[in-house]
Amino acid sequence: MTKVAKKIAKDLLDIEAVFLNPNEPFTWASGIKSPIYCDNRITMSYPAVRKEIAEGLAAKIKETFPEVEVIAGTATAGIPHAAWVADILGLPMVYIRSKAKDHGKGNQIEGRISEGQKMVVIEDLISTGGSVLEAAEAAEREGATVLGVAAIFTYELPKGTANFADKQMTLLTLTNYSTLIDAALEANYIEEKDVTLLQEWKKDPENWGK
């Protein structure tokens, strides 16, 4: 666990982009009961936090994919972070819709990419990875070479890990669920007795709490 990972996890807790509540779980749209709720869009409203995130993502991308030529953001949550990262790296930026428009030119990708252009796709949050992997596939259909995905946070769900492995897609994240639990405990957002319950959710979210 790096200092940056723990600092960003703490920041997400402090600005209430992330809530942990193992005793009164949230219900996701999928029906899964979860002790965590994450809305990283809130980071846009905190200049110091969003700057730290953008600089962290830019540094990871530059280190892992020095050959990157274009930054893509997923619509809508990945767009602002992609714009800030592209600005730091001095690179072109595009964004990828979840599906093609049903009017005009029917674009799924907004902005310009060229055949073989090396791309990193930015997402704010990774659960199963389904939507961002579909975005990466859409970019490749348009001619891009997707080097990998970069995100602020991952729940570290087994299904997500398996999906990225299945697509042979590299995933970079600034922080993760395990680090968040450690940071929350240190900052007294949770108690020691909550830790096991929180850790159990990550292993089997579909059956947790049943």
Swiss-Prot record:
<dbReference type="Pfam" id="PF00156">
    <property type="entry name" value="Pribosyltran"/>
</dbReference>
<keyword id="KW-0328">Glycosyltransferase</keyword>
<feature type="binding site">
    <location>
        <position position="97"/>
    </location>
    <ligand>
        <name>5-phospho-alpha-D-ribose 1-diphosphate</name>
    </ligand>
</feature>
<feature type="binding site">
    <location>
        <position position="127"/>
    </location>
    <ligand>
        <name>orotate</name>
    </ligand>
</feature>
<feature type="binding site">
    <location>
        <position position="103"/>
    </location>
    <ligand>
        <name>5-phospho-alpha-D-ribose 1-diphosphate</name>
    </ligand>
</feature>
<comment type="pathway">
    <text>Pyrimidine metabolism; UMP biosynthesis via de novo pathway; UMP from orotate: step 1/2.</text>
</comment>
<dbReference type="GO" id="GO:0019856">
    <property type="term" value="P:pyrimidine nucleobase biosynthetic process"/>
</dbReference>
<dbReference type="InterPro" id="IPR004467">
    <property type="entry name" value="Or_phspho_trans_dom"/>
</dbReference>
<dbReference type="InterPro" id="IPR023031">
    <property type="entry name" value="OPRT"/>
</dbReference>
<keyword id="KW-0460">Magnesium</keyword>
<dbReference type="GO" id="GO:0044205">
    <property type="term" value="P:'de novo' UMP biosynthetic process"/>
</dbReference>
<keyword id="KW-0665">Pyrimidine biosynthesis</keyword>
<dbReference type="InterPro" id="IPR029057">
    <property type="entry name" value="PRTase-like"/>
</dbReference>
<dbReference type="GO" id="GO:0000287">
    <property type="term" value="F:magnesium ion binding"/>
</dbReference>
<comment type="function">
    <text>Catalyzes the transfer of a ribosyl phosphate group from 5-phosphoribose 1-diphosphate to orotate, leading to the formation of orotidine monophosphate (OMP).</text>
</comment>
<dbReference type="InterPro" id="IPR000836">
    <property type="entry name" value="PRibTrfase_dom"/>
</dbReference>
<protein>
    <recommendedName>
        <fullName>Orotate phosphoribosyltransferase</fullName>
        <ecNumber>2.4.2.10</ecNumber>
    </recommendedName>
</protein>
<keyword id="KW-0808">Transferase</keyword>
<feature type="binding site" description="in other chain">
    <location>
        <begin position="123"/>
        <end position="131"/>
    </location>
    <ligand>
        <name>5-phospho-alpha-D-ribose 1-diphosphate</name>
    </ligand>
</feature>
<comment type="similarity">
    <text>Belongs to the purine/pyrimidine phosphoribosyltransferase family. PyrE subfamily.</text>
</comment>
<feature type="binding site">
    <location>
        <position position="101"/>
    </location>
    <ligand>
        <name>5-phospho-alpha-D-ribose 1-diphosphate</name>
    </ligand>
</feature>
<comment type="subunit">
    <text>Homodimer.</text>
</comment>
<dbReference type="GO" id="GO:0004588">
    <property type="term" value="F:orotate phosphoribosyltransferase activity"/>
</dbReference>
